[in-house]
Amino acid sequence: MMRHRGALLAVALEPTNMKKPKMRAVGVVPTQRQVAQLEHEHPEISRPTQLKVRTLDVGICGTDREICTFVYGAPPAGSDYLVLGHEALGEVVEVGSGVKHAKVGDLVVPSVRRPCPDPNCRPCQIDRQDFCATWKFNERGINQHHGYMTEFFVDDEKNFVVVPQELRHFAVLAEPLTIAEKGLTQVWQIQSRLPWACEEPGQPKGKGLRAVVLGAGPIGILGAMTCVLNGFDTYVYSRSPKPNDKAALVESFGAKYISIAECTPAQLAERVGNIDLVYEAVGVSKTSFEVMMHLGLNGVFVFTGIPAPEGHIQVEGNQLMRNLVLKNQVIVGTVNADKAAFQAAVRDLGEFKRRWPLALEKVISARHPVENFRELLTGKATGIKNVIAFGK
């Protein structure tokens, strides 16, 4: 008991040895080269602008699988493990006193990258850490920041986008879709250099243009959907010969599927005509540079994939340089995304659902219980997008 201003106040002291509550999580322990189910500290709101979110879905991607081979990925300072997961959908269960827009019960998707601490990094100072100038950012579930493959997580409201309830079953696709959203935004910025570049009222920007998407994985298929939505005559160039499930899916939303096994890059260019855009989503440098040799006049080539560091390829450097100069071509790489790209992804998922509901359903191959994590992260990759379902 303690006395304060003449009143008696009972003070309950928390035992110093009281353990904080734990919850399930999936992560890697790099020092032991383990992929494991972990007991992770249950998070609580510590700042007024934060949301506490219950995890519903977490998508599995190639980055997660690569982290599980221990080629990269680092735990936060003071931790010997890294909780995985950067593609997520959750439900708000608690809001801080300073939260302005989100409310309990909202569905939300979180972003991935957090700003670097350098006050002189102009991109990070304006929340454009996707263009961080110091390379000292951290990323949830990837580098020095725990991810979303756990039961609950807490983050600042500005790092979330609210999702309509009708997108409950698809919104986990928002993060991989942001790659195409940011990439296409940059394409329009680049192509504003063309003297005749202007929008026709009521017409999509890509009308009359041809796009080739390299790869039929989730990044490629979502990129192809975005290209079709924007009016491009869209071709997906991928390994497996027809007929196959991915080819059928691609053609169900209006794109065309061409197999690398049946058509060389030169033949591809003959079939397509002038290639205005190549959206690379395969992470294979040999195929990418072979197709780049056939990029059309005034074309743009967008790199999104990250190939393995080992290995070398031969490139026809002289011809490539001639093409870039004489054909007014541009090559651009894109990584990560800003909040506007997440908002665009949520908007376009709604449009995909309206136009191609069956195709959108097929992008998610299966939902799995948490207990299947090891097979999903370290076994043979199957299907298009596999999801771990934490909640209903």
Can you annotate each of these PLM segments?
Residues 275-281, 300:
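Short SAM/SAH-binding signature in class I
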Residues 285-351, 390-392:
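Glycine-rich phosphate-binding loop and adjacent beta-alpha segment
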Residues 117-210:
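NAD(P)H dinucleotide-binding glycine-rich loop of Rossmann-like/cofactor-binding domains
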Residues 262-273:
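Short amphipathic alpha-helix with an adjacent loop that forms part of the alpha/beta core around
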Residues 43-58, 73-122, 164-166:
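Glycine-rich beta-strand-centered segment in the early N-terminal region that forms part
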Residues 167-262:
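Mid-domain Rossmann-like dinucleotide-binding core that forms the NAD(H)/NADP(H) cofactor-binding site
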Residues 3-21, 289, 338-392:
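C-terminal hydrophobic helical "lid"/dimerization subdomain
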Residues 50, 87, 106-107, 123, ...:
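Residue-level marker of beta-strand positions
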